[in-house]
Design a protein with these regions (language model features):
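Bacterial N-terminal signal peptides that target proteins for export
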Residues: 1-9
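Acidic, small-residue rich beta-repeat scaffolds with periodic aromatic anchors
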Residues: 5, 26-36, 48, 126-194
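Hydrophobic core
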Residues: 13-17, 21
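Terminal domain-start segments
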Residues: 25-73
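Beta-propeller blade termini
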Residues: 66-75, 118-130
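Acidic/hydrophobic-patterned starts of short beta strands in beta-sheet-rich repeat architectures
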Residues: 76-86, 127-134
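Beta-propeller blade repeat segments, especially FG-GAP/WD-type strand-to-loop junctions
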Residues: 92-107, 145-151
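Short coil/turn segments at the loop-to-beta-strand junctions that recur within blades
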Residues: 109-113
Length: 194
Protein backbone atom coordinates (compact mmCIF):
# COMPACT_ATOMS: atom_id res chain seq x y z
CA UNK A 1 0.00 0.00 0.00
CA UNK A 2 1.15 3.55 -0.64
CA UNK A 3 2.15 5.63 2.32
CA UNK A 4 -0.81 7.62 3.48
CA UNK A 5 -1.08 10.88 5.30
CA UNK A 6 -2.89 11.38 8.54
CA UNK A 7 -5.54 14.07 8.63
CA UNK A 8 -7.27 15.22 11.77
CA UNK A 9 -10.60 16.94 11.35
CA UNK A 10 -11.22 19.08 14.40
CA UNK A 11 -14.28 21.02 15.27
CA UNK A 12 -14.35 24.70 14.67
CA UNK A 13 -16.96 27.22 15.55
CA UNK A 14 -18.93 27.51 12.33
CA UNK A 15 -22.24 28.73 11.04
CA UNK A 16 -24.41 27.31 8.27
CA UNK A 17 -22.43 28.75 5.38
CA UNK A 18 -19.04 27.91 6.88
CA UNK A 19 -20.01 24.28 7.50
CA UNK A 20 -21.16 23.97 3.90
CA UNK A 21 -17.95 25.57 2.65
CA UNK A 22 -15.79 23.35 4.86
CA UNK A 23 -16.86 20.32 2.88
CA UNK A 24 -16.66 21.99 -0.51
CA UNK A 25 -12.89 21.88 -0.73
CA UNK A 26 -12.74 19.09 -3.32
CA UNK A 27 -15.90 18.06 -5.15
CA UNK A 28 -14.09 15.51 -7.32
CA UNK A 29 -16.63 14.03 -9.75
CA UNK A 30 -19.59 14.87 -7.51
CA UNK A 31 -22.44 16.13 -9.67
CA UNK A 32 -24.21 19.41 -8.94
CA UNK A 33 -27.20 17.31 -7.82
CA UNK A 34 -24.94 15.40 -5.42
CA UNK A 35 -23.50 18.64 -4.04
CA UNK A 36 -27.03 19.95 -3.50
CA UNK A 37 -28.03 16.69 -1.78
CA UNK A 38 -25.02 16.99 0.55
CA UNK A 39 -25.84 20.62 1.32
CA UNK A 40 -29.45 19.64 2.07
CA UNK A 41 -28.16 16.89 4.38
CA UNK A 42 -25.98 19.40 6.23
CA UNK A 43 -29.06 21.59 6.68
CA UNK A 44 -31.04 18.58 7.96
CA UNK A 45 -28.31 17.81 10.50
CA UNK A 46 -28.17 21.46 11.57
CA UNK A 47 -31.92 21.33 12.14
CA UNK A 48 -31.45 18.19 14.25
CA UNK A 49 -28.35 19.21 16.25
CA UNK A 50 -28.36 22.99 15.86
CA UNK A 51 -25.69 25.18 14.34
CA UNK A 52 -22.24 25.11 15.89
CA UNK A 53 -21.97 27.11 19.09
CA UNK A 54 -19.86 27.14 22.23
CA UNK A 55 -21.70 26.59 25.50
CA UNK A 56 -21.53 29.42 27.98
CA UNK A 57 -23.52 27.83 30.81
CA UNK A 58 -22.66 25.62 33.82
CA UNK A 59 -19.32 23.81 34.09
CA UNK A 60 -19.12 22.99 30.38
CA UNK A 61 -18.23 26.46 29.15
CA UNK A 62 -16.62 26.26 25.73
CA UNK A 63 -17.96 22.79 24.86
CA UNK A 64 -18.99 22.88 21.22
CA UNK A 65 -22.56 21.94 20.44
CA UNK A 66 -24.45 21.63 17.18
CA UNK A 67 -23.12 20.51 13.82
CA UNK A 68 -19.50 21.62 13.92
CA UNK A 69 -17.70 19.33 11.45
CA UNK A 70 -18.38 18.77 7.74
CA UNK A 71 -15.84 17.42 5.28
CA UNK A 72 -15.83 15.77 1.86
CA UNK A 73 -13.58 12.68 1.90
CA UNK A 74 -13.23 10.19 -0.97
CA UNK A 75 -13.31 6.99 1.08
CA UNK A 76 -13.06 4.49 -1.79
CA UNK A 77 -11.08 6.29 -4.48
CA UNK A 78 -13.95 6.52 -6.97
CA UNK A 79 -13.50 10.32 -7.28
CA UNK A 80 -16.95 10.91 -5.75
CA UNK A 81 -16.39 12.13 -2.20
CA UNK A 82 -18.44 11.04 0.77
CA UNK A 83 -19.80 13.61 3.22
CA UNK A 84 -18.53 13.27 6.80
CA UNK A 85 -20.34 15.27 9.50
CA UNK A 86 -19.86 15.49 13.24
CA UNK A 87 -22.05 17.08 15.88
CA UNK A 88 -20.75 17.04 19.43
CA UNK A 89 -19.46 13.73 20.75
CA UNK A 90 -22.34 11.49 19.61
CA UNK A 91 -23.43 12.82 16.24
CA UNK A 92 -20.99 11.36 13.73
CA UNK A 93 -22.51 10.63 10.29
CA UNK A 94 -21.29 9.77 6.80
CA UNK A 95 -23.18 9.87 3.52
CA UNK A 96 -22.54 8.83 -0.06
CA UNK A 97 -24.18 9.88 -3.30
CA UNK A 98 -24.84 7.38 -6.10
CA UNK A 99 -27.53 6.65 -8.66
CA UNK A 100 -29.06 10.09 -8.17
CA UNK A 101 -29.64 9.79 -4.42
CA UNK A 102 -27.92 10.26 -1.09
CA UNK A 103 -27.68 7.41 1.38
CA UNK A 104 -26.31 7.05 4.90
CA UNK A 105 -23.26 4.90 5.54
CA UNK A 106 -23.17 2.91 8.77
CA UNK A 107 -20.42 4.36 10.98
CA UNK A 108 -20.24 4.61 14.78
CA UNK A 109 -22.20 7.60 16.07
CA UNK A 110 -19.62 8.39 18.75
CA UNK A 111 -16.74 10.55 17.58
CA UNK A 112 -13.34 9.13 18.51
CA UNK A 113 -12.04 12.07 20.47
CA UNK A 114 -8.40 12.80 19.69
CA UNK A 115 -8.33 16.30 21.13
CA UNK A 116 -10.28 17.32 24.21
CA UNK A 117 -13.84 17.01 25.41
CA UNK A 118 -14.29 20.64 24.38
CA UNK A 119 -13.07 20.11 20.84
CA UNK A 120 -13.84 16.63 19.51
CA UNK A 121 -11.83 15.50 16.50
CA UNK A 122 -12.14 12.78 13.90
CA UNK A 123 -9.03 11.12 12.55
CA UNK A 124 -8.55 9.99 8.92
CA UNK A 125 -5.70 8.29 7.07
CA UNK A 126 -5.81 9.39 3.43
CA UNK A 127 -3.90 8.41 0.29
CA UNK A 128 -4.55 8.69 -3.45
CA UNK A 129 -6.86 5.67 -3.58
CA UNK A 130 -8.63 5.37 -0.21
CA UNK A 131 -9.35 7.02 3.09
CA UNK A 132 -9.75 5.39 6.49
CA UNK A 133 -11.78 6.79 9.37
CA UNK A 134 -10.20 5.81 12.68
CA UNK A 135 -12.70 4.42 15.19
CA UNK A 136 -11.11 4.22 18.63
CA UNK A 137 -8.20 5.91 20.37
CA UNK A 138 -4.73 5.24 19.00
CA UNK A 139 -3.24 5.00 22.48
CA UNK A 140 -2.20 2.00 24.55
CA UNK A 141 -5.50 1.54 26.43
CA UNK A 142 -6.38 -1.99 25.32
CA UNK A 143 -9.56 -0.96 23.55
CA UNK A 144 -10.02 -1.87 19.88
CA UNK A 145 -9.05 0.57 17.15
CA UNK A 146 -10.61 0.07 13.72
CA UNK A 147 -9.71 1.66 10.40
CA UNK A 148 -12.97 2.00 8.48
CA UNK A 149 -13.28 2.51 4.73
CA UNK A 150 -15.96 2.26 2.05
CA UNK A 151 -16.35 -0.77 -0.17
CA UNK A 152 -19.28 -0.71 -2.59
CA UNK A 153 -22.13 0.88 -0.66
CA UNK A 154 -20.94 -0.17 2.80
CA UNK A 155 -18.40 0.80 5.40
CA UNK A 156 -16.02 -2.07 6.15
CA UNK A 157 -13.21 -2.58 8.64
CA UNK A 158 -9.84 -2.68 6.89
CA UNK A 159 -7.75 -3.24 10.03
CA UNK A 160 -8.40 -3.77 13.74
CA UNK A 161 -5.90 -3.78 16.56
CA UNK A 162 -5.55 -3.48 20.33
CA UNK A 163 -2.53 -2.36 22.32
CA UNK A 164 -2.48 -2.54 26.10
CA UNK A 165 0.21 -2.41 28.75
CA UNK A 166 0.36 -5.23 31.31
CA UNK A 167 0.24 -3.52 34.72
CA UNK A 168 2.52 -6.11 36.32
CA UNK A 169 5.21 -6.54 33.66
CA UNK A 170 4.95 -3.36 31.62
CA UNK A 171 4.89 -5.45 28.45
CA UNK A 172 2.61 -4.68 25.53
CA UNK A 173 -0.36 -7.01 24.98
CA UNK A 174 -1.35 -6.61 21.33
CA UNK A 175 -3.73 -8.05 18.77
CA UNK A 176 -3.96 -7.46 15.03
CA UNK A 177 -7.18 -8.45 13.26
CA UNK A 178 -8.05 -10.71 16.21
CA UNK A 179 -4.69 -12.52 16.39
CA UNK A 180 -2.15 -12.10 19.20
CA UNK A 181 1.01 -10.35 18.00
CA UNK A 182 4.07 -8.83 19.58
CA UNK A 183 4.38 -5.08 19.92
CA UNK A 184 7.04 -5.08 17.19
CA UNK A 185 4.78 -7.07 14.83
CA UNK A 186 1.93 -4.62 15.49
CA UNK A 187 4.20 -1.63 14.92
CA UNK A 188 5.50 -3.11 11.66
CA UNK A 189 1.95 -3.84 10.46
CA UNK A 190 0.89 -0.28 11.24
CA UNK A 191 3.87 1.16 9.38
CA UNK A 192 3.11 -1.06 6.37
CA UNK A 193 -0.57 -0.11 6.46
CA UNK A 194 -0.06 3.62 6.86
Amino acid sequence: MNKIGKAMLCTVLTGAMAVGAAGAADLGSLSPQGAKAYLNQITTLQNKYGKAAARTDDGFKGLLTGLSMAKLVDMDGDKIPELYCGAGLDGQHMYSYADGKIYALDIPEGVSNFATDVSPCADFYVDDTKAYLVDGHEIMNGFPVRYLTKQGKEIVTALTYTDAIDDDTGNHICTLNGESVTYHELSAAQVNFT
